[in-house]
Regions:
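Short, solvent-exposed loop/turn segments that connect beta-strands within catalytic domains
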Residues: 38, 51, 64-66
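Short, intrinsically disordered N-terminal pre-domain segments
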Residues: 1-14, 107-113
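Surface-exposed loop/edge segments in extracytoplasmic proteins
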Residues: 13-17, 64-72
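Noncatalytic modules at the cell exterior or secretory-pathway interfaces
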Residues: 39-45, 86-105
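Conserved Ser/Thr-centered positions that define the repeating blades of beta-propeller domains
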Residues: 59-61
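Surface-exposed ligand/attachment interfaces on beta-rich extracellular proteins
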Residues: 15-36, 49-53, 74-82, 100-104
Length: 113
């Protein structure tokens, strides 16, 4: 399965809808820029009601199959806005490892390049 491409200046939703359980978001292919040897992405998550517990990872991959953790966030009640160098990896995604929410709550995530 091919991943959608992420171009310099793009900001995309990491999840197709508000997330209420742990799970992997959409993976995106990072487009290459001539002369660029490392790639920097930004990522964030937001919420309608603050989760009481959360662990969310930014993961990157060379091949789009084998993903590795590059950043993690686990501070409930605050909104994450992070910037991470993912080296020469070609793909990125967000992965919600664990999440505890109140009734009717959900979180969203974004990735920028």
């Amino acid at each position: 399965m091919s991943q959608p491409s992420l171009y310099r200046g793009d900001l995309v939703s990491a999840f197709p809808a508000a997330v209420t359980t742990a799970g992997v978001g959409t993976s995106y292919a990072l487009t290459s820029i001539p002369g660029q040897f490392t790639k920097k992405v930004t990522w964030s998550y937001s919420f309608t009601t603050a989760p009481s517990a959360i662990v969310i990872n930014l993961e990157a991959s060379l091949d789009g199959v084998n993903f590795f953790q590059y950043d993690t966030y686990n501070t409930p009640g605050t909104i994450a806005n992070r910037s991470v160098d993912v080296g020469q990896n070609n793909f990125v995604r967000l992965n919600v490892i664990s999440l505890t929410l109140g009734s009717g709550a959900g979180i969203g995530g974004n990735i920028g390049y």
